[in-house]
């Protein structure tokens, strides 16, 4: 740790405290994540270390770079590139108004980061505005990729904040244990709607039951035909048969017709029907978009 000088505490992440720090040799500003482990007596599980070391190979401009892994006497500190703010803070500063072109740019960058990681069989599993970081150049980067697999997703953060269910798909809420890339695509859909509404969450549920009700009230309760595997999921229980909202115009009024179509393809209750990141990048919504 002598290599890095702590400058200030940035906040509490899902896995522990995050500090802004400076590399004493290069003077580069970095973010240090001290990972607190539940079973501190055991030290760092070797499986977690293996997973984390794989993440150092994820090099893409829309992924927060993991520079270094510092492992000493039962402590694990991850050294990441530093970004100025997360999407949640960005929303707070934009006063309920977000330019449609910025929405499109952020969504494109989010999908680019997802496509890259998914092509390497790395899932995020806990995407939310707090782990989408934005630097001074308006570049969006996905943080905490792969950490869920290495450490599991705790029920509570270390700041005692409950880990949010707002971005979880119905299959996961019904107890699905076999995750695929579709879990991240649902989260991307929720974030897309939140971008379009300048920071208003789409499904701000209070618990699993409320979360599923909010989803089904908007999208319609899936039938056995629409989602055959649903009733076999471990925590499945029947819900009232809500009809689907005919149009998303009132839900995301500032999103154009092609944007609403992309959103509908991301928010499919049946994970098999959800669009993948590569397909989403080819969607007509991005036809007139010129990546920087």
UniProtKB/Swiss-Prot annotation:
The protein's enzyme class: transferase
UniProt modified residues of type Phosphotyrosine: 15, 239
Gene Ontology terms, MF aspect: acetylcholine receptor activator activity; ATP binding; cyclin-dependent protein serine/threonine kinase activity; ErbB-2 class receptor binding; ErbB-3 class receptor binding; kinase activity; protein serine kinase activity; protein serine/threonine kinase activity
Residues recorded with modification N6-acetyllysine: 56
Pfam short name (any one): Pkinase
Compartments in which it is found: Nucleus; Cytoplasm; Cell membrane; Perikaryon
Entry EC number(s): 2.7.11.1
Primary location group: nucleus
Key words, A-Z: Acetylation, ATP-binding, Biological rhythms, Cell cycle, Cell division, Cell membrane, Cell projection, Cytoplasm, Kinase, Membrane, Neurogenesis, Nucleotide-binding, Nucleus, Phosphoprotein, Serine/threonine-protein kinase, Synapse, Transferase
Domain of life according to the entry: Eukaryota
Keyword Kinase: yes
Membrane topology label: Peripheral membrane protein
Chain positions found as Phosphothreonine: 14, 17
GO BP, one annotated term: neuron differentiation
Signal peptide extent: none
Catalytic activity, reaction form: L-seryl-[protein] + ATP = O-phospho-L-seryl-[protein] + ADP + H(+); L-threonyl-[protein] + ATP = O-phospho-L-threonyl-[protein] + ADP + H(+)
Cellular component terms per the entry's GO annotation: axon; cytoplasm; dendrite; growth cone; lamellipodium; membrane; neuromuscular junction; neuronal cell body
Annotated positions binding ATP: 10-18, 33
Family the entry assigns: Belongs to the protein kinase superfamily. CMGC Ser/Thr protein kinase family. CDC2/CDKX subfamily.
Function: Proline-directed serine/threonine-protein kinase essential for neuronal cell cycle arrest and differentiation and may be involved in apoptotic cell death in neuronal diseases by triggering abortive cell cycle re-entry. Interacts with D1 and D3-type G1 cyclins. Regulates several neuronal development and physiological processes including neuronal survival, migration and differentiation, axonal and neurite growth, synaptogenesis, oligodendrocyte differentiation, synaptic plasticity and neurotransmission, by phosphorylating key proteins.
Protein name: Cyclin-dependent-like kinase 5
